[in-house]
UniProtKB/Swiss-Prot annotation:
Topology class, membrane: Peripheral membrane protein
Locations listed in the record: Cell membrane
One Pfam short name: OSCP
Protein name: ATP synthase subunit delta
GO MF, any single term: proton-transporting ATP synthase activity, rotational mechanism
A single Gene Ontology CC term: plasma membrane
Family stated for the protein in its record: Belongs to the ATPase delta chain family.
Organism: Bifidobacterium adolescentis (strain ATCC 15703 / DSM 20083 / NCTC 11814 / E194a)
Function, in words: F(1)F(0) ATP synthase produces ATP from ADP in the presence of a proton or sodium gradient. F-type ATPases consist of two structural domains, F(1) containing the extramembraneous catalytic core and F(0) containing the membrane proton channel, linked together by a central stalk and a peripheral stalk. During catalysis, ATP synthesis in the catalytic domain of F(1) is coupled via a rotary mechanism of the central stalk subunits to proton translocation.
Subunit structure: F-type ATPases have 2 components, F(1) - the catalytic core - and F(0) - the membrane proton channel. F(1) has five subunits: alpha(3), beta(3), gamma(1), delta(1), epsilon(1). F(0) has three main subunits: a(1), b(2) and c(10-14). The alpha and beta chains form an alternating ring which encloses part of the gamma chain. F(1) is attached to F(0) by a central stalk formed by the gamma and epsilon chains, while a peripheral stalk is formed by the delta and b chains.
Gene this protein is translated from: atpH
NCBIfam families: PRK13430.1
Length: 275
């Protein structure tokens, strides 16, 4: 959890620079990638984080360090964002990397907006999340810090390589395993889904069933969860025959599993406990 100083710094910086990032169009892709790279560098260099967040150090010195870090080939807006971040006060040194990552995700969202792919990316992230729920061994390897990042990325693309995912979806999925940031893989994907949902002004409701939902079921679910959340929702329907029947519904981090397979598993646990 970020301290008050960091929350203020992050909010003010993003409020100030979000319009420029939003208006950067196709360049938002490049900026987002550069900020992800910077996040990774900061995460692996505590001395650099300290140098960039030291309140006793002149801002000009910290900006000079940033210029040395990113070089002359970085996008001007990347430099402007980082210069703004180092000029602010942070509760913890690691919070500047969090802010850089937030800007990186914003860049990817604005690029998705620019290419009319925002909803598509949100749905694909939810599909990836749902698929990994049934692959515990794979997802554990995707956030295994003892496995080299290159190997984790290779594993990811062996999973999604044949999927017709948007380039933004693939980049975000790659970022989540390339730079773990002390998070479980599904935790990061859910965080990204939530950010896209807030960005679009609607919630993503992932419904897993053994057979496709009917139009009437989708309409009913939209009405129920729109009323529950207080804003529009999108139903992401996932068909998984292994659940046998019933529904598993996920909204953000909240999961309601009333599938037949879940009930059978619960029954098995109950029988074992009383045996």
């Amino acid at each position: 959890m970020r301290g008050e100083a960091s929350r203020i710094a992050d909010r003010v910086s993003r409020d100030s620079l979000a319009p420029k990032l939003r208006d950067s169009g196709e360049d938002a892709w490049r900026i987002g990638n550069e900020l992800f790279t910077i996040t990774n560098v900061l995460d692996h260099n505590i001395q650099l984080e300290r140098a960039l967040t030291d309140p006793s150090r002149p801002v000009e010195d910290k900006v000079a360090v940033v210029k040395t870090l990113i070089g002359d080939e970085a996008h001007p807006l990347t430099m402007e964002i980082m210069s703004d971040l180092v000029a602010r006060r942070w509760s913890r040194v690691s919070d500047i990397a969090n802010a850089a990552e937030d800007f990186g995700v914003d860049g990817m969202m604005y690029y998705a907006d620019h290419t009319n792919a925002t909803l598509q990316v949100s749905i694909e992230l939810a599909q990836l999340h749902s698929a990994l729920l049934n692959l515990p061994v794979v997802r554990s390897k995707l956030y295994d810090a003892t496995v080299p990042a290159e190997a984790r990325i290779k594993l990811l693309y062996s999973l999604i390589g044949n999927a017709d995912f948007n380039v933004v979806t693939k980049r975000l999925a790659e970022h989540a395993t390339c730079n773990l940031r002390n998070r479980r893989y599904l935790q990061t994907i859910q965080w990204l889904i939530n950010k896209f949902s807030r960005h679009m002004g609607e919630s993503m409701v992932t419904v897993t069933t053994a057979t496709p939902l009917s139009k009437e079921q989708v309409k009913k679910l939209v009405a129920i969860y729109s009323a529950k959340t207080g804003h529009p929702v999108h139903i992401n329907s996932v068909v998984d025959p292994t659940v046998l029947g019933g529904m598993r519904i996920q909204v953000g981090d909240e999961v309601t599993d009333n599938t037949v397979v879940a009930q059978l598993q619960h029954l098995q646990r109950t029988v074992k406990a009383t045996a």
